[in-house]
């Protein structure tokens, strides 16, 4: 199956692909792109087609550094199937060339891909998944991994996220899986009749 060269996309074209992609989130959405634009960054949407269908895309922003050089950043990485070895390779090459043609000095990505499964205490789950191959593939493209740091860093997105698997679980089972302090906080909120209401943009 033939892959295209890297294409520049309109905001609408990118959003149509990104809005249904499993790795999509606010940080790589068109709304994030608009936020970067308001802060003076240049905003690009680029992608690759396979046999005429969009197969990979990314929000790519850049800002001027010293002289004519620019810093490029793909917030939360590329939207593609990282298990498809051909796609990450083609996307990396295309984006690197795109940045180079625009005096890019540095290109940063922080893919929205889970690296390894841990339990609620931060311990590695025995027989859990590990996506080291994705790290290896990106390093083979020329990226340098910055290590598995902990804590908060204003220059980087959070590395650790807590995710609760909701599949095939009733309310009580889910509740019991919470940390004891979290269960206490929920019960306290219920006693104080604190309620969450879902609201649209018009109520914000």
Question: Whereabouts are the PLM-identified features?
Answer:
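Acyltransferase donor/substrate-recognition loop-hinge adjacent to the catalytic core
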Residues: 2-9, 56, 131-204
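N-terminal charged segments
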Residues: 6-51, 56
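Short alpha-helical segments and helix-capping/turn motifs at coil-helix boundaries
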Residues: 30-31, 90-95, 145-148
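Conserved donor-binding loop and adjoining core beta-sheet/short helix segment
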Residues: 35-127
């Amino acid at each position: 199956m033939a892959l295209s060269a890297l294409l520049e996309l309109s905001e609408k074209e990118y959003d149509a692909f990104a809005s249904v992609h499993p790795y999509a989130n606010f940080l790589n959405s068109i709304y994030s792109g608009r936020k970067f634009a308001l802060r003076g960054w240049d905003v690009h949407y680029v992608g690759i087609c396979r046999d005429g269908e969009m197969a990979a895309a990314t929000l790519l922003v850049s800002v001027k550094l010293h002289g004519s050089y620019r810093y490029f950043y793909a917030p939360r990485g590329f939207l593609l199937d990282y298990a498809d070895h051909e796609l990450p390779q083609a996307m990396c090459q295309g984006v690197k060339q795109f940045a180079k043609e625009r005096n890019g000095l540095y290109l940063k990505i922080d893919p929205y891909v889970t690296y390894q499964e841990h339990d609620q205490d931060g311990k590695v789950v025995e027989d859990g998944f590990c996506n080291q191959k994705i790290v290896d593939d990106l390093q083979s493209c020329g990226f340098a991994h910055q290590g598995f740091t902990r804590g908060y860093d204003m220059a980087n997105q959070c590395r650790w996220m807590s995710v609760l698997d909701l599949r095939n679980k009733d309310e009580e089972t889910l509740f019991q899986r919470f940390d004891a302090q979290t269960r206490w906080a929920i019960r306290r909120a219920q006693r104080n009749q604190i309620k969450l209401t879902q609201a649209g943009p018009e109520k914000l």
